[in-house]
């Protein structure tokens, strides 16, 4: 979810994108991303420029929480000259949220699943050290332990937003949502004591946990099982919060424009599998708090279908609208 994670993952794919089928290379190949580089723009730009390959360029279509990049993909020709690397929720969740969206979940052509990430709930120095579990957190909130805002997330209408809303309802406590413009400012406020709780990708917490000092404590992870990156942290369900939706994960995937040929998607997916099999790719994903995810067009298409169907009842239960 953070811009650094999107861009570094994109850079790892550029060598094989540069070797796309001949028709795709007849014109510059665009790799669309929906998020800005943020504070690491110089480092990421150098990394990308060294690996772009002939005729390939990364193009950030920033805005709308990633929606604009998907909408740009929908306008592109279906000849392989434009690809999209995006969190899957831009395709599966957003059609439930925005009635005027320029695409549906079935419109982008699935190519390959690349990596998955889990979400976690963590607290910062504004929360007493005695708060070690979700039960402790709920008790502290109910007792009026803080005058600070509720839980922060990287943005409104994102998976962490819904995880927080479902937790608040299940715990029967008042924990308002605070939407940030990305993970970086939210983590800054969490570490600075201006935010009590943050829900976001596990990778957002890992550098601070590795630094030690106890400034950040992760109380729960979303998902059906514990995270390989946070094996000592119990899931929401293990702590008595098993509502549907608290098992949400995110998937990074590649898509082509609507009506792209199946053979083209298969060719690109085969190259993606080769890159994912490289040890350097595995090391990169681990540093970012991501797990490898395998799946070609058919498998990704089924995951998209199931995920889109799962989000509908969750959105209805939370009652989210763009105006809310």
Model-derived regions: residue spans:
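N-terminal (or domain-start) structured segment
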Residues: 20-107, 156, 172-201, 206-208, ...
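Immediate post-signal peptide segment of exported/extracytoplasmic ligand-binding proteins
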Residues: 20-31, 77-81, 138-149, 211-215, ...
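Hinge/capping helix and adjacent helix->loop/strand transition within the periplasmic-binding protein
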Residues: 75-81, 96-185, 236, 251-284
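A ligand-binding cleft/hinge motif common to bilobed small-molecule-binding domains
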Residues: 89-100, 166-170, 197-233, 312
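C-terminal lobe and pocket-closing loops
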Residues: 116, 206-276, 309
